[in-house]
Amino acid sequence: MTILNPITFPVILESLLASNDLTEEQSKFLMNSWLENKIEPVQTGAFLAALRAKGVSGDELSAMAKILQDASTTPSDLPSFDLVDTCGTGGDGANTFNISTGVAFVSAALGVKIAKHGNRSASGKVGSADVLENLGLPLNVSSGKVVEALKKLGITFLFAPSWHPSLVNLAPLRKSLGVRTIFNLLGPLVNPLRPKSQVLGVAKADLLDPMSVALKGMGLKRAVVVHGAGGLDEASLAGANQFRFLDKDVIRSEIIKPGDLGLTQISNESLKGDDLKTNSHILKSLLNGEGNQYHKEVVALNTALVLWVSGTEDDLSSGVKRALDCLNTDKSWLLFEQLRDFLAT
């Protein structure tokens, strides 16, 4: 009887088509092959389609993410203090304003060390990089400057394409496929500054478990994965939000409504953004203490999650209150201006 080598392209594809999860070795082999440009475009299309049809596992994600993170541009002088990243997988189609970007600056204004890892929009929605650039923040900055900003100001922004040069070859094919793939899930997992805590939003409830397992597999101390009411990849004011809380290798599930934390329940329509100009105006007003109440409340809700994962607050209600107090000042905007000016020099 002939025993097939399990680490070959045909065997891996057959396994995926049979709805079997890949082993750690197969996952790493596949990612390394992509990074080394050893997979033909037609094979890549088949693998990406098969992974999506099967449904990705948390172990597959963590194995691939570790390889991708190791291949990123990693500064030699990584900060010694613990960092937090806040982002979503995107793909919710809700066209909200840039909630997680606002959360990053409010959290940093409250003393959390934030390494925000982001990109331009791939779907017509305004991405974090788009809105920050429009407000004057330079994107193409040296890795040393990015880390220096973090040490000096407690917040920095990593423009993803500058830190993952090995993925350049895959970009045209991913775009031509026209559907979301495993790379949309890997992006939020591979911050090159290796934060020990993270708040991560998912647009589909069936991603809650694999993404929380992936974060655990990558060794994070604390994390929150959230699927917002109404399908947001952020905690929402629209109703019951589904959570996975990771703490000391234990993952627990919880459902939290806005009213549980003293917040207004209102539809996601109230959180709509629009074009780049509109989203930039919303973000600037919000950080300046001038945003509307619903914008403040949804940012406060998500900031409370950051305060929890960072160990700053153990109680979400207290975190919401601290965030709302901050959002009634211009502290977050002043911090943005400091980061913008520092990165521009």
Swiss-Prot record:
Anthranilate 1 binds at G88, N119. 5-phospho-alpha-D-ribose 1-diphosphate binds at residues 88, 91-92, 96, 98-101, 116-124, 128. Pathway: Amino-acid biosynthesis; L-tryptophan biosynthesis; L-tryptophan from chorismate: step 2/5. The gene is trpD. GO terms for molecular function: anthranilate phosphoribosyltransferase activity; magnesium ion binding. Mg(2+) 1 binds at S100, E234. Keywords: Amino-acid biosynthesis, Aromatic amino acid biosynthesis, Glycosyltransferase, Magnesium, Metal-binding, Transferase, Tryptophan biosynthesis. Catalyzes the transfer of the phosphoribosyl group of 5-phosphorylribose-1-pyrophosphate (PRPP) to anthranilate to yield N-(5'-phosphoribosyl)-anthranilate (PRA). This is Anthranilate phosphoribosyltransferase. SUPFAM superfamilies: Nucleoside phosphorylase/phosphoribosyltransferase catalytic domain, Nucleoside phosphorylase/phosphoribosyltransferase N-terminal domain. GO terms for biological process: L-tryptophan biosynthetic process. Binds 2 magnesium ions per monomer. Disulfide bonds: none annotated. Mg(2+) 2 binds at D233, E234. Its cofactor is Mg(2+). It comes from the Bacteria. Homodimer. Its EC number is 2.4.2.18. It catalyses: N-(5-phospho-beta-D-ribosyl)anthranilate + diphosphate = 5-phospho-alpha-D-ribose 1-diphosphate + anthranilate. Anthranilate 2 binds at R174. It holds the Pfam family Glycos_transf_3. One of its GO terms (cellular component) is cytosol.
